[in-house]
Amino acid sequence: MHHQQSSYGGGYPGQAYRQQQPNNAYGYGQPSPQPYGSHHNGYNSPQQNYGPPSGGHMYQQQSAYQNSYNQGGHGIPARPPDQPVSFGQGAPQEYAYRYSACTGTRKALLIGINYFNQKGQLRGCINDVKNMSTYLHENFGYPRENMVLLTDDQQNPKSQPTKANILRAMHWLVKDAKPNDSLFFHYSGHGGQTPDLDGDEDDGYDEVIYPVDFRQAGHIVDDEMHRIMVNPLQPGVRLTAIFDSCHSGSALDLPYIYSTQGILKEPNLAKEAGQGLLGVVSAYARGDMGSMVSTAVGFFKKATKGDEVYERNKQTKTSGADVIMWSGSKDDQTSQDAQIQGQATGAMSWAFISALRKNPQQSYVQLLNSIRDELSTKYTQKPQLSCSHPLGDLIDVPVLGSGFIWFWVLSIFQCQATK
């Protein structure tokens, strides 16, 4: 998530990316270990700090929800199409997205790391996991036995958020996922950046998360998380991911990032152009013609590289699965530990739940704006929305009108409500 605003700034200290495997290899075909069958093993029951949103448990009261939706003048929404739908918006032509009915298995992996007795100790990450697990169970029907909680206050060694345990749990989350399954990933802890080694980042840095034993085992880079949790998914599988961490804007390496207006973002060449022009003007004012030329050439190369990286990522990291990621900050921003209503919590995790409690009937872009509104009065971080495929018409639902399925309108958890 974060760092403490008062005593710990600037993000977590970066380390060179260690291209090492965990002590044990976790193949997809291996059975999941017993502790991942239930989160009760060595873990206290979650605190019920966040109650269900008004209207009760949506996964148990579908008819009641539809009645309230119809009162808004939207009519009875249709079901999503059963056939694959072409992406468009610059996505590779060979890909097609399949809508998920989300009637299958629900599984969740939630990781919260306070880094006890370490530099940069946090206070709210474990509370984030407790609050989120309760919210998922009470409002969207995620079974307790299908949740894995990794927090560093647990006695069971397999429930500690070590690098090996986190990687193993990531494999567990996506193992045997089938169309219409709903998977959920939540990380609250330190994040950072490290130099990009494979050329897939337009800013030259990979995003990383820090396990509790990162000093010994190293961090986990975004490329690896994408390979484990996104690549194996079939069309029709839903994965919702939340990263409450610093520098987390592209923590899953999803190629489609959306603005608060619902516009697909391109590489920020305008910003680069302004910086490049400023450098050229400064060099000209100094009479340094050599520097002026080198600055202009450097900008051109950087802008060209950014555009090439963006196009390459669309070709290699687009997915037919439905992967949606909400992150606590942009790649160049930090996220905050917060004290809200007497409880230490991650600002992003709190804002996410708070926004949905106030209005569970939001589109993607509405929820992104709602989360930002929750944070705007106290924090400078700007949450991001990124996807494995273009959202198209899914990004925005008008306040008035019909023809949009309620399956879409529920935004981040919409498919969990269709059980």
From Swiss-Prot:
Signal peptide: none annotated. Keywords: Apoptosis, Hydrolase, Protease, Thiol protease, Zymogen. The keyword Translocase does not apply. One of its GO terms (cellular component) is cytoplasm. Its EC number is 3.4.22.-. The active site is at H190, C246. Residues 59-71 have a biased composition (Low complexity). Pfam families: Peptidase_C14. Residues 41-51 have a biased composition (Polar residues). InterPro entries: Caspase-like_dom_sf (IPR029030), Metacaspase (IPR050452), Pept_C14_caspase (IPR011600). Residues 1-89 are annotated as: Disordered. One of its GO terms (biological process) is apoptotic process. GO terms for molecular function: cysteine-type endopeptidase activity. Belongs to the peptidase C14B family. PANTHER family: METACASPASE-1, METACASPASE-4. Involved in cell death (apoptosis). This is Metacaspase-1A. The gene is casA.
